[in-house]
Structure formats: structure tokens, C-alpha cells
Amino acid sequence: MPPTPILILDGGLGTSLQDHYNITFSSDTTPLWSSHLMISDPKTLLSCQRDFTTTAAVDVLLTATYQVSPEGFQRTKTPSHPSGIPRASIAPYLRTALDVAGQAVQDTSASVALSLGPYGACMIPGQEYSGKYDGEHDDEEKLWRWHTDRLGLFDDDEAMEGKGLRERVKYIAMETVPRIDEVRAVRRAVGSSKGFCEGVPFWVACVFPVEDKDTLPDGSTVDEVVEAMLLPVEGGATPWGIGINCTKLHKLPRLVGLFGDAVERLLREGRIQERPALVLYPDGTQGEVYNTATQTWEKVQDKSGADDSRPWEVQLSQVVNDAAATGQFSSILVGGCCKASFNDIKRLREQLRPE
């Protein structure tokens, strides 16, 4: 069996900006969160993203667009847009985000992935850990329309500088999805944006924040999630990769095993024909938990994974190597999410690719 290729993804952009560049965020003043820097401070954004491409030497860098949405821009008040940034004025900022990522990977071998979070990441307070959405976005059809509309923001000559999407990015990342109906909705959004997204592989990564349960916040099992990710969906595109992000590291060994088992079952039953890539980027937290009410990271007594005192990168590299050894995935893309710094990713790369 040939070895499974392993690629390195970057870490948590928002928390890196907070922890290493003293940037502060709040839903009142920066409703776009880390995406706000494409408006306020592209230079600092570039420095932070370069930390990942130079020091950490990642293979894939996510754009600073995770929280992008028409609603988020409308809530963002600037001197030139004191009442909020209208839809007609969004494109130049998206171009800035793509340009900054492009500059960060310049003179490196890294590629860019367009980062797109779930609807819950654009709510105030954020609901990507709960999946508790408002009535206007509470089923697959409504979420499909929202995601299609959000993708449409990028399908703009000014945002793309007249280029196709695949000239600007190598991947699309649909991230931190907490609901099974939203998994299907994002696949349909990519499918219905076929002309724009054509030729750009995408991944869907879900969040598993419920302690002692291997389910999404909506109760969906891994088997159900993998089926929603890979089985035919009317009008939906098939992802290149499936996986897990924004989830505690100690949950990964079991979850990855369940993902692999689900893939094997679908192959055995003839319901899928190809192995997907596995995409993993767990939180880099050391006991901190994000409080959506106070919008801060708080240290809590968390014994859930305390029996493993090995460094984050050692634990994660073992999960990756174990998954690679099964041959269940076509390749593995691994990095970090919240609180994972460029130094963490550098150490992860050194674990997986010792010189």
C-alpha cells in the first residue's frame, strides 16, 4: 500500500491575531471578527499569515474570510461607511483578503484555500458550536440560499480582479459546520455555483463540541454525517475532503476511527467509488473554552483529556500517522484551529516531517 500523502494546514487566525498581535475583537465593533483586518489593517493581517507560511512552512493557507457575510459587513461601521458597509461596497475588501493571502504564500510552495464558515459563525453571539439558528436559517433550503448568496459575493470581477476562482485559490473550505442539513446545504451551494467554483476542490469540516458524545450539536452521528458529506445530493457537488475542525484534540482518535469506518462501509456497499481526503484541524487549546457571551477564552477545569500530557503536536501527529496507516483516506490535510499558533504548526510539521 503506497503511503498516504500528508499536507500541513495553518492554525487559528483570529486567536493568533489576539495572542501575538494584540488585536481585540468584539461583536459590537468588529462583527466580521478576524475578517475585519481586511478592512482595518491588511498589513498586520499579512504579517500574521506570513508567520504560517514562513516560520511554519504550511502547504495550505486559509484566507481571512471565515466570517464574511452580507450581514457582517452591514454591521461593520467605518468612517467611509458610518451606517455599515453595503453589499455594493464589499468586493474590494474581499479582493484585499485574497491579495493578502496571495502575498503571504508568495515565494513559498503553499497554496491558498478560501475559508467559509457556517451561518452560525455570522450570528451574534456565534452559534457554530450549538447550531441553534434563527427561524430564517433553520432548514436546508434556507441555508442553501444563504450559502449560495454568500458565495456569490466572491463571484464578482472586482473581488476576483477579473480572474477565475481557481486562479486565486486551490481549495474552498466549508468549515465548522454544526448541522447535518447545513452539510447538504453547502454541497448544494457549491453545486449551484458550478460556473464559479468549477475545478476548485472543496472540503467540508464539521465540529464535534459535545463532551462524551461523538455527534454534531444537532445529534447527528458520524455515520450520518459522512453519508451527508459523500452520498449523492441533488444539485450538490462532491467534496474532495471531509473532516473535523474546531474540536478538542482528545476527541480525535475515536472520531477519526468512526470517519474511516464510515468511508469503508460506503465503499464496501458500492455507494461511493473513491476515497476522500481527511481534513483535521482541532483546537490548540490548553484547557481554555470560548465563552460566546463574554467573547473571551476562559480557563476551566477540564479533565476530559487530562490523562494525556504529551504536547499538542505529538498527540495530533499520532492521530494523523494512525489514520494514514489505515489507507482509508486518499490524503490527509492537518493543521490547527482556535489557539493553534504558527509555532504549534511548525512543531507539528517537524513531528510529521522530521528532517
Residue positions per predicted region:
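Domain-level signal for soluble alpha/beta catalytic cores
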Residues: 1-355
